[in-house]
Regions:
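Conserved N-terminal substructure of TIR/SEFIR domains
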Residues: 1-67, 151-165
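C-terminal interaction surface of TIR/SEFIR-family domains
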Residues: 4-7, 52, 106-165
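Short beta-strand/turn micro-motifs composed of small residues
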Residues: 10, 75, 103
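Short catalytic/ligand-binding loop motif for oxyanion handling, primarily in non-cytosolic enzymes
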Residues: 15-18, 81-83, 107-112
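Short, structured coil segments at secondary-structure junctions
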Residues: 28, 95, 117-121
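Inter-motif core of Ras-like GTPase G domains
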Residues: 68-73
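Conserved TIR/SEFIR loop-to-helix hotspot centered on a Trp-containing motif
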Residues: 77-94
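A short helix->loop->beta-strand "cap" motif at the edges of active sites that frequently abuts
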Residues: 94-100
Length: 165
């Protein structure tokens, strides 16, 4: 089994669950980075008390995603509202990364998936199915789940059809 570098994308309100997931992945031997950056009340990234330019944040995120073999999106009730989350997912897709969604423990059944995840992500799994994550990182395909870990009807993807000439 080859261990993979893993990048975790998340909403800042889900940091406690992020820490739980980081601990579980590290215990299994994975090297993990996350998109955790210090933000002020206006959701602007700060470092040593100063605002950081969006271009600098974007460069950091692209670099961290490039480093990773697998990209995980921690999906909470408000994850879909964050522009940086969609930015990170799109970048992971453009860099050819496997994109796996994990619902936050206790997440509402009707948690909305980020738009970019609907387009580029794999089948999401519930927090109670976190043991499946290692297999998914290694390429195993799992059926889509709802936040509680029960089977989804599978209708989560926006299908885009093109006609080739």
């Amino acid at each position: 089994m080859v261990m993979s570098n893993v990048f975790i994308c998340h909403h800042s309100k889900d940091v406690p669950k992020l820490r739980d997931l980081l601990d579980k992945l590290k215990a299994k031997g994975y090297t993990v980075k996350s998109s955790s950056l210090q933000e002020d009340r206006d959701n602007k990234v700060v470092h040593k008390g100063k605002h950081v330019a969006d271009a600098t944040v974007a460069r950091y995120i692209r670099s961290a995603i490039r480093w990773a073999g697998t990209f995980i999106v921690l999906i909470g009730e408000h994850t879909h509202e964050r522009p940086w989350v969609n930015y990170e997912i799109r970048n992971a897709h453009f860099q050819g990364k496997k994109i796996i969604g994990v619902y936050v423990h206790g997440c509402a059944q009707d948690a909305e998936l980020p738009e970019a995840y609907k387009r580029y992500g794999t089948s999401p799994i519930g927090w109670n199915s976190i043991d499946k994550l290692g297999g998914m990182i290694e390429g195993k395909v799992e059926p889509a789940e709802l936040p509680d870990g029960s089977a989804s009807n599978g209708n989560i993807y926006q299908m885009i059809y093109i006609k080739c000439k």
